[in-house]
């Protein structure tokens, strides 16, 4: 397996410390947060958030580079996708965190609203659609549903699909799932696979932001076929920036597609770096450009890693 990405992340510890200090100097994070992050880096506890828009290949990447198998499903919709936390364990097992009774009541209220009433309001329409989808999938639990709310549930690794699969029994009430996996390079590492930003499930989006704020590094996955488009720019500058943009690492996924079309790795990297620089200027914040200039995109290919 090609584990260069995690080796490179480990080698970037000193760089992360420097970037964290700069992030504090520019006011992106507090001195207390700076000290917390640096202590965690020095103590070999590395939390990596993996983000990216739909179709950027996050699940395929994690399956190839972490699990070496098709573990995480790629077909789950943004409406029902749970936050996944991957870390080391002596054996393969999972622990699911379910929505609280209060959070579930909020979803029931959203689901009771008419789509016609929110027509034209994209954000509210998304919330209502998500809630209705959750309620529809919740029928699988029947009258036992309420007994799970507010609880954590451990289960065998073989049942992971029941919590993260599109048709899983518990997908409707699962806010996050922790996956324990016996890989040496996961020792002292916590990889957080996020559903994304602008999440229609407010409580889940808050959990995503919470994890990204404590992350030592954030791996932003770009698709080589359309690297750093308007959606990527929004994710980086409007969302990740609030969590401390100095800790961002850019990964260009599926670069082999562009490579086969005649582009070299160097050309792809230079293109992305220039796009980031131009976007930082367009956002009118030179400090962003300064923080990101030390970020060198890492070419990734889940498909090539499996060959």
Regions found by a protein language model. Give the residues of each.
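Charged, amphipathic alpha-helical linker segments immediately N-terminal to NTP-binding catalytic cores
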Residues: 1-26
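Globular "head" domains of long coiled-coil molecular machines
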Residues: 10-13, 35, 39-307
């Amino acid at each position: 397996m090609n584990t260069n990405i995690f080796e490179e992340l480990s080698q970037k510890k000193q760089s992360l410390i420097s970037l964290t200090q700069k992030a504090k100097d520019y006011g992106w994070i507090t001195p207390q947060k700076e000290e917390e992050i640096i202590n965690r880096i020095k103590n070999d506890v590395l939390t990596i958030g993996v983000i990216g828009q739909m179709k950027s290949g996050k699940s395929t990447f994690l399956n190839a580079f972490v699990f070496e198998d098709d573990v995480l499903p790629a077909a789950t919709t943004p409406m029902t996708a749970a936050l996944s936390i991957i870390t080391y364990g002596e054996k393969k097992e999972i622990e699911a965190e379910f929505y609280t009774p209060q959070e579930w009541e909020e979803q029931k209220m959203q689901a009771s609203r008419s789509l016609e009433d929110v027509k034209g309001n994209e954000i509210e329409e998304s919330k209502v659609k998500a809630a209705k989808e959750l309620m529809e999938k919740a029928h699988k639990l029947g009258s036992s549903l309420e007994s799970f709310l507010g609880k954590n549930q451990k289960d065998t690794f073989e049942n992971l699909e029941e919590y993260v699969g599109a048709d899983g029994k518990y997908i409707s009430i699962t806010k996050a799932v922790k996956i324990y996996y016996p890989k040496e390079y996961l020792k002292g590492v916590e990889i957080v696979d996020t559903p994304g930003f602008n999440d229609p499930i407010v409580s889940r989006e808050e959990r995503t932001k919470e994890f990204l704020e404590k992350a030592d590094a954030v791996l932003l996955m770009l698709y080589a076929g359309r690297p750093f488009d308007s959606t990527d720019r929004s994710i980086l500058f409007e969302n990740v920036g609030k969590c401390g943009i100095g800790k961002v690492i850019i990964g260009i996924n599926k670069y082999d597609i562009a490579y086969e079309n005649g582009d070299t790795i160097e050309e792809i990297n230079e293109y992305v770096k220039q796009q980031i620089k131009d976007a930082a200027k367009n956002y009118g914040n030179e400090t962003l450009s300064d923080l990101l200039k030390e970020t060198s995109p890492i070419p990734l290919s889940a498909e090539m890693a499996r060959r």
